[in-house]
Structure formats: C-alpha cells, structure tokens
Amino acid sequence: MKAKLIEIHIFPKFEAAFKAYPQLPIKRLRYLCELIIQTAKETQGVDKLDLGLKWGEPAFRSNIGSTLRIDWKSKNPEQYALYFQCSSRLIETFRLLYEPKLRFEGNRAIIFKLDQEIPIYELKECIKACLRYHEIKHLEFLGIK
C-alpha cells in the first residue's frame, strides 16, 4: 500500500525520553520510530498514531491497534527491543511465522542486537499487525500471509 497522510500526535515527553539513552541505542531506536511511522502510513485502517510514553518508554498507539513500545535497557546494553502487549496473540503468532529470523523474549518482545541487521519485511509485518490488532485479532495468524 502506498503511504497516506495520517494524524500523528507527539506528546512532549516522547522526545524527552530519548535524552536518557546512549548514542548508539538512540540511532537504532530512532530508526525503529521512523519505521513504525512509515509503516503506519502504509497500513490500511490506520488514520491516527499517538507517540507518547508508557511505563517510561517511547510508545506508539494507533486508532485501531495495540500499544507498541521501544526501549534499550542498561542491564542488556548490547540489545534493544520492540515490546508488545503480553496478553495479546501478537508474539505467539510472530514466533510461529518468523522464528528464527526474529529473536523473541517471552511473550512480550522482539529483541535486536545493536550490531544486527534488521529483517525489514518481517518486522514491518509485525508492526502492521500490532497497529491493526483490534481489527485482526480474531483472524488466523492475525491475517498475516
């Protein structure tokens, strides 16, 4: 799908959260931000995207989806992650479709090494599913083909 205009609301604390990260993780997290926004613009049914904080982490929420968070943690400084609602079917489905291309942590995250090349196609499919979750949660494999 071609990119479309969507309403994006950025809460002030969203940008401030990035000041707490070291330089290399900031670059990776900013890249994920851009990828999430671009994917939202390409995703059917997504007309609005809020960028804020949830549990102190940069978070994204569409008008029809589940919350998606990104973070880097000092206890695992060589990695960063994309976090999903743990009570959803998202990670369980992604694991069936995309393991071992993507690395998972429990039922809540996709983990990346700071020096890893990201599998863009698979990651965008995961982001789309999260952004549309409330419309697709009843579908087999969340409608991912």
PLM-predicted stretches and their roles:
Residues 1-145:
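Charge-dense, helix-prone N-terminal extensions
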